[in-house]
Amino acid sequence: MQKTCEDSYSTTFCSFEDMQKYHEDLTLGSQWLRYKINELHIEPLDRTSSLYGTPSSFAPRVSVEAVEDTAQNLGLAMRIGTDYYPIRTTAYKSLLARAKISGTVLPKLSREKLARILNDCLSIYSSEALLLIRNEKVSAAHSGNPVDYSVLPIDELLKALMRGLDDRFPGSKFQSGYSDHALTSASWTMPGQKEKLLDTYEKVLIAQGKTTMASKLMPGIRFVTSDTGVASAKVSAMLMGTQYPIHIGGCVAVDH
């Protein structure tokens, strides 16, 4: 059984209530911390590192499983204050951005060399980083400038979206939801709006002899967001009912 601290953890939802409760709990258990970039310190966390063998160096709620999983994945830890936290793979891109370095060769370096390079670069910058600590690991290292990044709690986004659907498209039905450490998504169908929204599409398909396909089509929306910098908060209109949902037009997006 997967543990929430594992980088590969993911879960699905069959009801909006379950998805909302999951993200409310996630928000309560998450920490957003501001630290000077030059106060951050990176250490290697693979099986050969000294930190791997000293679990007492980690923050009180960091489990042995979280340390072991990190040693198998990114292999780095961050010292925040006096405690160390494993770094999740989702934080790698934003950590490089705070150090202002990039390159395909970096992942190929030993964890000791990579940590040393990161520390040398991080020490130069006095601006702030906005750190997300979630499920026992540093999950993101965003810019601390509010112009660059704003926290948009997923549970609040879901509530706002549900209110909008109830107001504008009454009768909308939650279809499915998904969440992992990088991304959260959900989809709804709008059976009450089918006749109004799909009249033109159905007429075209029926004229082409695709009556069965026309009868299966259902308008819907797909919601996607991320706390780790993978995506903005966006809602896309969809045609559902076929094997693969079809995007209609563009999307409404709000950057974090």
Locate predicted features.
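Intrinsic disorder/low-complexity polar-acidic segments
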Residues: H142, Y149-H256
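Feature for intrinsically disordered/low-complexity regulatory segments and propeptides
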Residues: M1-A160, F169
